[in-house]
């Protein structure tokens, strides 16, 4: 087999990865000299860990072809050596599909062992994963494929009872209408699919340099999805050196080693479950990843008891569901030493129940796919653990807390969080406008979070400045919903709001003002939900409450303030 040259542009006319904003060389040099950035790629890190732990357990989980039926506890077990074999088979599958090193591959897999096989396989092969969620639908996937020029789309037919083949056909047809080449579909759950012979290590191609970095470790390794505050999720280019620094330090802070067993109940593709310290942190430490087919307490508790899992990352609604269930059932969670809670603010009253009910230490986590990650530490005062979201990973994480005019706020006062550092990006992929608004000229990322800093340095999240709904840790851009309503419905105005909810944090609400002389029918909610599904919107974004009004209320000075209006209507919908 001929290997790809470092200047390969990919198969079937696939374009090379476009340039994206990089950290200035002087700053990058400091990060190297400080030991934050090391000259190691994902391929090198994974092969090193495989060689060091070849006979140790790497992953426990269901297979994709067992998803339509069977028990949620039916599992396979792979050692690190077996994971390598499966990953090399996945790499062979990518090669047979026409993928070449440097090409982008959309990975849209549930929590099955195939997720790890194809993630590791893509990294070993030199393809760049684009981590989509199983919940994403045709509208979002069309955008991901078009913006990345993805060469392949890896799915598990039947996952979450969804027809991913039909989904692919739907958006592929739309791409072809635009003169674009759709990604090749790879269905890992197809029992008739040809099982390729795994590649040998010596057949792995040479890595491709993307964006001209002199060090391969400072090239992009994959594209993660942002939570999104405007439209479809933005693409986040993560480099080997920066991301692996975050993974290594997270694993150290969280005390991972070769005996660690992490239960992954949330979607594996989430940045939280991927790297904080997540799946990659466990693989770095030589531990085992326990994949739960669903996040229910029943499934999770059974796996914790059977596999002796000792760490579990959760979002607040899931943590609260575990607490409520544990109070009723008294499961054996004696192996669990650490429960991480992140993705949204965790109410102190709920946080206080983690240790007495689940029997594990609580660690609050506050981070973002763009970079900055904060953890409470093992030796933190209990009150800080219950009420704050921790301190940054790195001594070189820079944090600014500013008022609306861009001035530093007095210590202890809430303000807008801006940050830059050794693992925070300097810009999105292919998003010139968003880069101008989301990043300052000197490279600080405007997170959209409102925080206050305690004298100890701990950050406490008090709210959001950006227009975004946080539903069970899934971030939903209100502009996407409002634009869709204006485009597809007979309305003159639309406002999407987050409705406070104890179970999921916020539910999706939509307020509509019909055009003059137009009506939305007897059941506007049903009409909206059907229309949004037809547009290919992910189910978690579909409005759960719809209100029709003759006009939108004005502020006391006669103007429409979108920020005040959303707060006013959210309060009304919550009644």
Task: Identify the function of each model-found stretch.
Residues 2-12, 120, 127-199, 516:
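Structural core segment of the AMP-binding/adenylate-forming
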Residues 36-38, 55-112, 116-120, 137-142, ...:
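Conserved AMP-binding/adenylate-forming core of the ANL superfamily
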Residues 77-81, 221-248:
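Conserved AMP-binding A3 loop
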Residues 136-143, 153-155, 312, 421, ...:
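AMP-binding/adenylate-forming catalytic core of the ANL superfamily
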Residues 244-261, 271-311, 325:
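Conserved AMP-binding/adenylation subdomain of ANL enzymes
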Residues 309-313, 325-384, 398:
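Gly/Ser/Thr-rich phosphate-binding loop
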Residues 385, 400-418, 455-456, 518-525, ...:
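Conserved beta-loop-beta connector loops within the AMP-binding
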Residues 392-396, 407-438, 476:
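Conserved ATP/PPi-binding loop(s) of AMP-dependent carboxylate-activating enzymes
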């Amino acid at each position: 087999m001929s290997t790809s040259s470092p200047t390969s542009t990919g198969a079937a006319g696939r374009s090379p990865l476009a340039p994206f904003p990089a950290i200035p060389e002087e700053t990058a040099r400091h990060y190297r000299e400080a030991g934050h950035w090391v000259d190691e790629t994902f391929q090198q890190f994974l092969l090193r860990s495989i060689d060091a732990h070849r006979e140790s357990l790497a992953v426990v989980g269901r297979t994709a072809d067992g998803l339509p039926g069977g028990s949620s506890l039916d599992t396979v077990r792979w050692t690190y050596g077996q994971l390598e074999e499966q990953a090399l088979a996945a790499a062979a599958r990518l090669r047979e599909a026409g993928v070449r090193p440097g090409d982008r591959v959309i990975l849209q897999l549930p929590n099955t062992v195939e997720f790890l096989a194809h993630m590791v396989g893509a990294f070993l092969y030199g393809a760049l994963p684009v981590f989509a969620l199983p919940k994403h639908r045709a509208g979002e996937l069309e955008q991901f494929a078009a913006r990345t020029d993805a060469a392949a789309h890896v799915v598990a037919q039947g996952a979450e009872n969804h027809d991913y083949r039909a989904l692919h056909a739907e958006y592929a047809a739309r791409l072809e209408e635009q003169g674009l080449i759709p990604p090749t579909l790879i269905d890992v759950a197809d029992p008739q699919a040809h099982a390729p012979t795994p590649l040998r290590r010596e057949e792995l191609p040479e890595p491709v340099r993307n964006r001209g970095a002199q060090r391969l470790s400072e090239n992009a390794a994959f594209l993660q999805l942002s939570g999104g505050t405007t439209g479809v999720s933005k693409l986040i280019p993560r480099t080997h050196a920066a991301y692996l620094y975050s993974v290594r330090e997270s694993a150290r802070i969280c005390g991972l080693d070769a005996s660690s067993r992490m239960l992954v109940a949330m979607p594996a593709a989430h940045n939280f479950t991927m790297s904080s310290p997540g799946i990659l942190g466990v693989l770095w430490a030589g531990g085992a990843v326990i994949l739960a087919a669903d996040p229910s307490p029943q499934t999770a508790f059974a796996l914790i008891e059977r596999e002796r899992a000792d760490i579990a990352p959760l979002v607040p609604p899931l943590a609260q569901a575990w607490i409520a269930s544990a109070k009723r059932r008294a499961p054996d969670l004696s192996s669990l030493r650490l429960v991480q809670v992140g993705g949204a603010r965790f109410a102190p009253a709920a946080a206080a129940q983690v240790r007495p009910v689940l029997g594990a230490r609580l660690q609050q986590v506050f981070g973002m796919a763009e970079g900055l990650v904060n953890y409470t530490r093992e030796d933190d005062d209990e009150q800080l653990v219950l009420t704050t979201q921790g301190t940054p990973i790195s001594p070189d994480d820079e944090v600014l807390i500013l008022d609306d005019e861009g001035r530093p706020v007095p210590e202890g006062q809430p303000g807008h969080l801006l940050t830059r550092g050794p693992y925070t990006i300097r810009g999105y992929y292919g998003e010139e406008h968003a880069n101008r608004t989301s990043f300052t000229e000197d490279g600080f990322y405007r997170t959209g979070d409102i925080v206050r800093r305690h004298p100890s340095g701990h950050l406490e999240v008090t709210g959001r400045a950006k227009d975004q709904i946080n539903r069970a840790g899934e971030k939903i851009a209100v502009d996407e919903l409002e634009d869709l309503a204006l485009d597809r419905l007979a309305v003159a105005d639309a406002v999407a709001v987050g409705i406070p909810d104890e179970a999921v944090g916020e539910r999706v609400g939509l307020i509509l003002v019909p055009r003059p002389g137009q009506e939305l029918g007897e059941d506007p909610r049903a009409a909206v939900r059907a229309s949004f599904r037809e547009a290919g919107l992910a189910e978690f974004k579909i409005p759960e409450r719809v209100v029709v009004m003759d006009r939108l209320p004005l502020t006391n000075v006669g103007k429409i303030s979108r920020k005040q209006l959303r707060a006013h209507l959210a309060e009304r919908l919550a009644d």
